[in-house]
């Protein structure tokens, strides 16, 4: 167990370092790899992916994958994470920033990330600067990527190599389900359980707002006095746009700021067939026999019609 935890921590550190080297991403919480630290398996029994625990807003994604693959073949699974590239999010320091994207792909056991020598030059060019890693040493069939710049990577391409049932007895020629998730933007909850500044914050008590001040860091300090004269102060993070002003009467839990969340997480599932080349050849041979039989029947019919015509003429 201790060895597995060490490798998970090491893999997490390397992923962060290489991703940061590839892209200068400012104060992002769009790390699918954060799930590696808190979840041994990112997919719960009910099918929910761990990423949805931090990215509370739902946004659609799309999956593009071949319907069937042959053993030892290399193919691509593409996760599309669309969003309006003109929109910006609030970074951790309250400044506007472009959205980042991340993705997770849960493949059937036996399927795994293709090696560099197996990846085509076209895919290498598309994935330049993108680091895809296995979820852990235990689950090399689960791949994660991110955070990466969303403007240039709304399509996440995962090069995958199919297993060979001849070499792996646990793999059969079957139809397998696989699962994908993709997020854009920062999450609303940190892995520690704390809320990020990508949230709508409610009043801690009802009453009148007697004062709103701005701190040196750009934070908004709101003072509320209730009907009993009790005073509370709330500090909202910099960059949040207030919905209230001094003198307003608010109820408890009433939103004090506009919801700044412009991102979200989505998950989808699909199927892929691991096909046997011998079965495909057998099917083609069967189709050829059917075609040949049909041709012979047509020729025989024409021959019979000629014989009948000759007898009538006679």
UniProtKB/Swiss-Prot annotation:
Heme binds at residues 31, 51, 54-55. Keywords: Chloroplast, Electron transport, Heme, Iron, Membrane, Metal-binding, Photosynthesis, Plastid, Signal, Thylakoid, Transmembrane, Transmembrane helix, Transport. GO terms for biological process: photosynthesis. Its cofactor is heme. The chain crosses the membrane at residues 280-300. GO terms for cellular component: chloroplast thylakoid membrane. Its main location: plastid. GO terms for molecular function: electron transfer activity; heme binding; iron ion binding. InterPro entries: Cyt-f_TM (IPR024058), Cyt_f (IPR002325), Cyt_f_lg_dom (IPR024094), Cyt_f_lg_dom_sf (IPR036826), Rudment_hybrid_motif (IPR011054). Residues 1-30 form the signal peptide. It is found in: Plastid, Chloroplast thylakoid membrane. It is a single-pass membrane protein. Binds 1 heme group covalently. The keyword Transport applies. HAMAP family: Cytb6_f_cytF. PANTHER family: CYTOCHROME F (PTHR33288:SF10), PTHR33288. Component of the cytochrome b6-f complex, which mediates electron transfer between photosystem II (PSII) and photosystem I (PSI), cyclic electron flow around PSI, and state transitions. The 4 large subunits of the cytochrome b6-f complex are cytochrome b6, subunit IV (17 kDa polypeptide, petD), cytochrome f and the Rieske protein, while the 4 small subunits are PetG, PetL, PetM and PetN. The complex functions as a dimer. Belongs to the cytochrome f family. This is Cytochrome f. It comes from Thalassiosira pseudonana.
